[in-house]
Design a protein with these regions (language model features):
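A solvent-exposed, acidic/Ser-Thr-rich amphipathic alpha-helical stretch
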Residues: 43-110
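Short, low-complexity N-terminal intrinsically disordered segments enriched in polar/charged residues
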Residues: 1-37, 41, 49-50
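Conserved aromatic-histidine-acidic binding/catalytic patches
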Residues: 20-23, 78, 113
Length: 194
């Protein structure tokens, strides 16, 4: 009977380990998705919470407050952005550490142009307190280009095919907070701050 119990216990332990790995993969994949949405919503607070609290920002210092300064500067270079996660790979170092790549298409509105970039984010992840975080993100691009015909200009309307004005990115409560007091900068970046 002991042998059968040991075998059953071994199966349960292996099943638990597999389930743990699947849950970790899903949590790490959600990091990339949450990053894209937070960036597009200008939700800087939630963007920062995706990183370890002692994130190394290189020559600028350590910590989320240092990272905040960087993201606020970067995100004020564009008005609307759309980040699309198109693929994700994950390699586990051990149960609490992993590396990965996130393939991402990023679109940025800059004044009268829309810039599109095909990126690969090289990530390092760590689990702390049962939750996965970014330790590091290093973006690299295959290309960055201007759309041939930007989705605005003299013949463009902000109304969609159904006649409704798009609600994004203004639907995100953090969007208004981010741009509050910066209407002049927004006007430099877009003709249609819907």
């Amino acid at each position: 009977m002991t042998g059968a119990c040991d075998e059953l216990l071994g199966r349960v332990e292996r099943l638990e380990a597999r389930l743990e790995r699947v849950e970790s993969v899903q949590s790490i994949e959600r990091l990339g998705q949450r990053y894209a949405l937070a960036a597009d919503a200008r939700d800087i607070e939630n963007l920062l919470l995706l990183f370890v609290d002692d994130v190394d920002c290189g020559r600028f210092g350590v910590g989320r407050d240092v990272l905040r300064s960087s993201y606020e500067v970067v995100h004020r270079q564009f008005y609307r952005t759309v980040h699309q996660v198109v693929g994700h790979t994950i390699a586990f170092v051990d149960a609490d550490h992993a590396t990965g790549t996130v393939l991402m298409r990023a679109e940025h509105e800059v004044a009268d142009r829309w810039i599109v970039a095909m990126l690969c984010m090289f990530d390092t992840y760590e689990r702390r307190g049962g939750e996965w975080f970014f330790v590091r993100r290093k973006p690299e691009s295959w290309y960055v280009t201007d759309y041939g015909v930007p989705p605005h200009g003299p013949d463009w309307s902000p109304e969609g095919w159904d006649g409704r004005t798009p609600r994004l990115p203004h639907l995100f409560p953090t969007w208004a907070t981010f741009w509050d007091g910066n209407a002049a900068r927004a006007a430099e970046l877009t003709d249609f701050p819907v």
